[in-house]
Amino acid sequence: MDRIRIRGGSELNGTIPISGAKNAALPLMIASLLTDDTLTLENVPHLADVEQLIRILGNHGVDYSVNGRRENQDKGYSRTVHFTARSIVDTTAPYELVSKMRASFWVIGPLLARMGEAKVSLPGGCAIGTRPVDLFIEGLRSLGAAIDIEGGYVIARAKDGLVGTRFRFPKVSVGATHVLMMAASLARGQTVLENAAREPEIVNLADCLNAMGAKISGAGTPTITIEGVTSLSGARHRIIPDRIETGTYALAVAMAGGDVMLEGARADLLETALDVIQQTGAEITRADTGIRIRRNGNGISPVDITTEPFPGFPTDLQAQFMAVMTKAKGNSRITETIFENRFMHVQELARLGARISLSGQEAVVEGVDRLKGAPVMATDLRASVSLLIAGLAAEGETTVNRVYHLDRGFERLEEKLSSCGADIERISG
């Protein structure tokens, strides 16, 4: 199993290209199920989750090619991929595929809208009564679907098609907003989604669906209106730059020091996070070509944050921000409001010398002068990269195990950091 070794103490200087956003790519790829024409997506990141979704879509009959060739590229940055679902050969998404990636459950919306039926496994770990998929089920029922749960599968039917509705999300959900927006695109009549997620990835999907012939307005606001159409066509669409990758590398510079240009990054996608990073003492310059971040040797200022839906501070940057706060000059308070159990990185950061106390969904980080390298274990995608950020500023050698988590969401991370002076390498086996 691969691991990554970091020797801390080096500043970061240079240019890092920002890849296409994973959280935008996945729903856009799933949208290919809505049409029998070809959907061409530009700036698709080369990630384990993307490759897994390609396999899942293939199970339903979606063919794909990379720059005109059917292949699974092992190397290369974000690329252009063509997806074609001439016919849906299977409306079942089996457990062995869905269990590997929660976002694959989202195929339920397009399959139901196009074929009138879908049988999709519940994602692994869903407890009855607290399932994250409850919002999806409520929304699809509101569109007229008959839904049963049998043997660990959600079985959805809409024999006469979906019908427009007015649906208010009980709580903001990015995934459920994606799914209902796709499903409602082919429903009869008008659908109004209230308390919808406002994330840039929602806007990116709406723009793509509109290019395919959908009639969607209000994406990026709490109220999205969809006028159903009878069919969608193919389109060519570009995936937005990854705001979480942007924030991650900005935080890496805030931690290690240096001067880095994040090429292709868009500041408007993460203004709140950039403001917070600036408060830690980093200097941020917004440009047409990207974002430049600099930090000299003046130390890191403590900042309190609370994670919130967009446009608030993103939960997907919480772990990385906590890593930076471990070396701040004072105490900081981090409150997680989006997900439960999202402090799994705390124990591993403590192995490096961090001082963090937990109380429910709140963490208090007491900044220390020195972190010391140690072997650590990645527990999930965002936690794993927080350990790398801490390792950049730790004395000696830090080894991060289980880095397959990183490969799910960061394209060639160690190569990008190494090009800016980090002493980092992947060790195979």
Swiss-Prot record:
It is an enzyme of class 2 (transferase). It is found in: Cytoplasm. GO terms for molecular function: UDP-N-acetylglucosamine 1-carboxyvinyltransferase activity. UDP-N-acetyl-alpha-D-glucosamine binds at residues 102, 131-135, 171-174, 316, 338. The active site is at residue 126. Phosphoenolpyruvate binds at residues 22-23. One of its GO terms (cellular component) is cytoplasm. The keyword Cell cycle applies. It holds the Pfam family EPSP_synthase. Its main location: cytoplasm. The modification 2-(S-cysteinyl)pyruvic acid O-phosphothioketal is found at residue 126. Its EC number is 2.5.1.7. Keywords: Cell cycle, Cell division, Cell shape, Cell wall biogenesis/degradation, Cytoplasm, Peptidoglycan synthesis, Pyruvate, Transferase. Pathway: Cell wall biogenesis; peptidoglycan biosynthesis. It catalyses: phosphoenolpyruvate + UDP-N-acetyl-alpha-D-glucosamine = UDP-N-acetyl-3-O-(1-carboxyvinyl)-alpha-D-glucosamine + phosphate. One of its GO terms (biological process) is peptidoglycan biosynthetic process. It comes from the Bacteria. Belongs to the EPSP synthase family. MurA subfamily. Cell wall formation. Adds enolpyruvyl to UDP-N-acetylglucosamine. PANTHER family: UDP-N-ACETYLGLUCOSAMINE 1-CARBOXYVINYLTRANSFERASE. NCBIfam families: murA, PRK09369.1. This is UDP-N-acetylglucosamine 1-carboxyvinyltransferase. It comes from Chelativorans sp. (strain BNC1).
